[in-house]
Every structure is written in C-alpha cells, then in structure tokens.
C-alpha cells in the first residue's frame, strides 16, 4: 500500500490516534485502538492509508471512520478502496486456517500467494468532488488497514 502512494505527503489530523510519545513509551496497549492515517497527493490523485491497530491481536467489529480529504480538484474522480483485514488480502489468516503448515504444499502455497494479493473492498466508485473536498464514512475493523485512492485522471 505504501508503494502505491506517491507525491508529497500531506497533513493528517484526527482524534482517535495515539501520539508518538505514547507509542514510543508504551506502544498501543490502552483501552482504545490507534486509528490514524498517512496521506499523499499528486496532480492526478490523492491517497490515504488508514489503520485501526492494537498490540492485542484481537479481531473486532472496529470503529466508524470519517475521512475528509481536502484540497482536491473539483469534478469527477474515481475512488478505489482497498482493504487488508481478517477476510481480505491476508495470507497470514489463511495460513492459520490451514493449520499453520511449516512446509506448505504446492497447492497451499498457491492459495497463500493468491490470498496475499491486495483486494478492493468494493468496486471502484465514480465520485463528484465539490468545494475541493471529499468525505468518506466507513467501518474500519480492528487490526485492519484501508487504502483509499482518489484518481482524477480521465
């Protein structure tokens, strides 16, 4: 996902993120998860990587997330929403369900390889950007990552 980001990094703000010192001093072990993001922008697109993380590797329903991307080009664009979670783009979860084989068979290896490919959460959507801003609301499961790409190329 990071390899799909290009351009200049842009500021991200939110009220569900742990700060750097808290993560450095005690990691993410409190009551709540760390929901944070990285974002970048080029002349043709904007990308946002959003995560919901906790040191306790416990799956869960997650949290509602609102992502507002500002400074976009007005007009039509295409939104791509990719996801890594317990059910998508996650060969580790598939490997555990296989019984954690130390020496996967050729068939298991192919399944693992395919399950690790980045998947779209939904079909690409046509969106209309107004006032240079696009707001997106979605549920982000615990221990999951979403990658949003807003592409204004025609």
Features from the language model and the residues they span:
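Beta-strand-rich recognition/accessory modules
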Residues: 128-154
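Generic detector of short, locally flexible boundary/turn motifs and exposed helical patches
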Residues: 12-15, 32-33, 45-47, 101-103, ...
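Carbohydrate-binding surface patches
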Residues: 27-75, 81-95, 142-149
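Generic detection of short hydrophobic beta-strand segments and adjacent strand-loop junctions
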Residues: 10-20, 63-69, 123-129, 138
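Catalytic cores of secreted or luminal carbohydrate-active enzymes
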Residues: 1-27
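Hydrophobic, Leu/Ile/Phe/Ala-enriched alpha-helical segments that form helix-helix packing faces
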Residues: 2-6, 69, 113
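Short, charged low-complexity linker/loop segments at the C-terminal edge of domains
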Residues: 7-12, 89-90, 153-154
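Acidic, Ser/Thr/Pro-rich beta/coil linker or hinge segments at domain junctions
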Residues: 72-131, 135
